[in-house]
Amino acid sequence: MPVVTLAVDAMGGDHGLSVTVPAVAAMLSRHEHMHIILVGQLEPLTSALSQANIADHPRITVQPATEVVAMDDPVAVALRQKKDSSMRVAINMVKEGRAQAAVSAGNTGALMAVSRFVLKTLPGVDRPAICTAIPTANGHCHMLDLGANVDSEPAHLLQFALMGQAVVRAVDGVEHPRVALLNIGEEDIKGNEQIKEAAGLLREAQGLNYVGFVEGNGIFSGEADVVVCDGFVGNVSLKTMEGVAKMIGNMLRQEIKQSWLRKLCGLFALPVLIGLKKRMDPDHYNGASLVGLRGVVVKSHGGTSKEGFACALEVAQLEARRNVPSLISDALGQPGTH
């Protein structure tokens, strides 16, 4: 198996080095054919590597960067002022061919803007999108756009559908993914004109297994492998899912603590509860792809744990090995990036 190299923004996110370095250590122990370039401010980064006992790891390279994009930095600051940020340097490495993918837990808007500026979009892509896996009753689906584009034209939704199909084929091995449009109803008469026009485009697209509209509750029942929506709807949906999952976990804990009998029942049900938590845990599905770019870029949730960041690294290495940008180019009928 060939070695895949990931460029990691070690400083990004709410927790920075305390999450990224342990996650990298875990990934290197799982994957023999992986090299990590850790990008960040030299002194704190080398200190974190020493604390994790991986300072001399043969498959880790340290790339200095003098600046960090803060979670509340405006996009313009990240793009025009912080040109030596750990985020920017990591993405530059993909452009230069020194890495096959970049991973960051930093500011989403900044990451999309910098990635688009440095890597550019693939031929035929008007707007990149954010795509991630969502848990369902029988596995998971992929949903896009999750916030890159607040407003999207019908033609953009068609591009999202084609890109999502390419991602699912690559990472899940589903040859003919079921593609659906997220709508307020399943009937053809439901929805605004934008959605209705997009439905017509998806229905006529050759090679696209379009199965119609899906409602919000249909996302989780496994009715589709790819769920397409604009970034406003997608981001609200994603945050709602995360909030509901967190609420259910908190409610279960509160109910179990009500009495000793409930605590005893909770103890017997522990294996079931652990399995349920794993299936619903946002960290387990951490790692959103910025699709439509001339390179693989994966966004980790800013507040994720080391386990969650490791999941984002898994997504990046898989998409890099499958050369997802090239597959997206093929899906759009454009020359690929090989």
Swiss-Prot record:
BP GO annotations: fatty acid biosynthetic process; phospholipid biosynthetic process
GO CC aspect terms: cytoplasm
Pathway: Lipid metabolism; phospholipid metabolism
Domain of life, source organism: Bacteria
Compartments in which it is found: Cytoplasm
Alphabetical UniProt keywords: Cytoplasm, Lipid biosynthesis, Lipid metabolism, Phospholipid biosynthesis, Phospholipid metabolism, Transferase
Subcellular location, principal: cytoplasm
One Pfam family from the record: FA_synthesis
SUPFAM superfamilies xref list: Isocitrate/Isopropylmalate dehydrogenase-like (SSF53659)
Catalyzed reactions: a fatty acyl-[ACP] + phosphate = an acyl phosphate + holo-[ACP]
An MF annotation (GO) of this entry: phosphate:acyl-[acyl carrier protein] acyltransferase activity
EC number(s) on file: 2.3.1.274
Oligomer status and interactors: Homodimer. Probably interacts with PlsY.
Family: Belongs to the PlsX family.
Physiological role: Catalyzes the reversible formation of acyl-phosphate (acyl-PO(4)) from acyl-[acyl-carrier-protein] (acyl-ACP). This enzyme utilizes acyl-ACP as fatty acyl donor, but not acyl-CoA.
Name the UniProt record assigns to this protein: Phosphate acyltransferase
Organism of derivation: Alcanivorax borkumensis (strain ATCC 700651 / DSM 11573 / NCIMB 13689 / SK2)
Gene behind this protein: plsX
